[in-house]
């Protein structure tokens, strides 16, 4: 009998080669362009993967020349390029960068942009694809999209495409997400809309599907029969640096991190195998996970399963930190949470009875994002001591950042006559196994958008179903007569005691990072 083909042997990491393209970045004078987007495009060029006859146009309100814009971007590239900065390569690369000044609401500015794009096509001798990247503030998305449509830039020239990439946050609740989706749908087809979440561009996040479905030692055990619980932690050791307090105080950890980044990781861990690796097949399974989340409705259910907290004054790495309400641009009476922990249940056959614990917070002891899958303990270990039995669970740890990799914790006998058993770690690290640093998330995602692969981008129904779940928690916090308590924790700790109690009530505890 012939061996069945494994569809995951051609993995999500397959390389793409895009056709000639112009990328237009709206909000090009902002931090994202300088720290992430231009260094990512430069790294793609350094690897030889940039499409031929490539162009970048920065679209923003400030007066700048092409040369002035290039000089500013060069400074950011020196600080942030994964490949390091090479003056000769930059000199060649910078010639593809141009600047276009316009207000976001000025139709004439978009018509002039269209003329510039047409001029590039004339210089190439043929039309090129066009990728519009919305890196501006969220409130600017609507006028930008409306002006793109009014200027006729949402249609490709000839047989070439026009696509849009939308940065997070994509709305601030279900109503605004639906409204924004409607505006996007009026301008671009869903197949040409790419809602970006940079966590999905990280190598280890992409590897979750391969780890699960291409390795027979894991998939048969990836269910409630063998898995006790799953933890997802995103810890940050910073607060509101860089003037983020103004934005963050209108969002909070639940909206800023859980609704997008951590739900994306959750769906990759919990999804069923897709029928193939097409974008919609993968995203169909991810949406099913979001829809299967057991709703948390009302203050009682939210209070029992969700812990929110603000940090008070403390120290991180020996540096004194002020409390959240004392941060610059934060309301002194703020009800916004920089820390949240959740206990979630997924009502599917595979995950019945398996809790998923999620926590994210600022001013914690270290910066780290990881997923830990905790397997059930064996029913009996004849040679085990009671102490060893308490620590006998096998754990699969997927490190998203830093030091991307995967570790499996197992039990082994210590050398010697006695039957002493100790937990040891089998560790895979990208840097040591492949001998080079992983590509930055934005490198992969930009190439995918240019190549037309939407697998690692959120679909409309995925975004809206995630907001539907989050809105119930926000409603219990801010619109109920008896809202759950806002707890506190000192900066430099691992969060409030109540977050520990959330697991202790189930006979579990957070994994030490």
Residue map of PLM features:
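Secretory/organelle targeting and membrane-embedding segments
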Residues: 1-166, 170-513
